[in-house]
Amino acid sequence: MNFKLFGSALILSGTALGAGMLAIPMVLAQFGLFYSTLLMLIICAGTTYAALLLTEACSKTELAFGINTVANKTIGKGGQLVTNALFYLLLFCMLIAYILGAADLIKRIFSMMNVEMSIEFAQVAFTLFASAFVVCGTQIIDKLNRLLFFFMISMLVLTLIILIPGMTVENLSQVTNHDKGMLFDTSTILFTSFASMPVIPSLVAYNKEATKQQLRNMVILGSIIPLICYLVWLYAVVGNLTANEITHFSNISDLIQTFSAKNEYIEIILSIFTSLALLTSFLGVAMALYNQNKDMISHNKIVTYVCTFILPLLGAGLAADQFLSVLGYAGVILVFLAIFIPLAMVVTLRKKETEEVHQNLHIYTAEGGKLALGLTLLFGLLLLISQI
């Protein structure tokens, strides 16, 4: 087993697997498990192929450490400007959200231990702690992420051990909403749960000695792990509660509180899981932004650090809770970044490439030809329609 590639797949998974996973049953339970599972499989397939397209663009663009260089060498200056603007907007939104979420969680954990802490101090402490690992490079993040991911999956397994005995066939077969239009509207929410594209340029550069088959397997494994976790969690929650109960929860805390009444340890376990999910997501996104800043702005570590961590930290302090409403637009930004831009890059590259490219063992080309590209375009358009 190639542990470097396996670790890279876990970085992909850790970036996609966020605390938002806990909310998936609240969105899908009402539609029943059959259609929820089908939609999740379609979204996973679409995002995985789009990730493979970006992997192709990165592997065919030598010495590209960030999406800035990849865009410049594929879709020109205009495309590069659009890509960078969307990329920065998305990553800043994501980092601010993770800082806000992590700080709130840290404050709550310390309150349980009767230690009072201001939210501002918690934000600074989390950012300084997590950023220390990011500046050490992709190799350190890879090794740390493997450890964090192991503990995160362990917490999920413990939760399932507690929940599985309470599952009933009646709950698993329930459907309270037959409106397929409303189900379709949840597509973008699920899409953001599978999106790990910001880290792909860094991981392709990190695994520059990998063969094209290894790069493909890295992306596929990094997509399948979140899919399995989401489905298992969805089935466990739906099997224990009625759809009406789940859909009436206003936030994740209500869900956790309901399960806490059944088992006193589940609140602690899910709090640990949420903490680890936030940290792994932060590390992946921060790594992508840090490498992007090195690639685009400066190789000076101080300048890069300020642009990567201090600006989102200031944003978290200024925006506070109301900023979370802006994250609703992140799905639209992500459709362009994760679907349309990789598609444009690959179409441009394939027009220029020679037979030598196909014979090179280290240059990856996504399978499927023009049909797969057309289906990817349709997938992206449908995601945009679901937002209207």
UniProtKB/Swiss-Prot annotation:
Membrane topology category: Multi-pass membrane protein
Disulfide-bonded cysteines: none
Localization annotation: Cell inner membrane
UniProt cross-references to InterPro entries, sorted A to Z: Amino_acid_transport_2, Trp_tyr_transpt
Lineage top rank: taxon: Bacteria
A GO molecular-function descriptor: aromatic amino acid transmembrane transporter activity
Keywords linked to the UniProt accession: Amino-acid transport, Cell inner membrane, Cell membrane, Membrane, Transmembrane, Transmembrane helix, Transport
Chief location category: membrane
Any one biological process term the GO annotation gives: amino acid transmembrane transport
Transmembrane annotation, as ranges: 5-27, 31-53, 86-106, 121-141, 147-167, 186-206, 218-238, 268-288, 302-322, 326-346, 368-388
Any one of the GO CC terms: plasma membrane
Family, as annotated: Belongs to the amino acid/polyamine transporter 2 family.
Function: Seems to be involved in glutamine transport. Complements an E.coli glnP deletion mutant.
Protein name: Glutamine transporter 2
Protein species of origin: Aliivibrio fischeri (strain ATCC 700601 / ES114) (Vibrio fischeri)
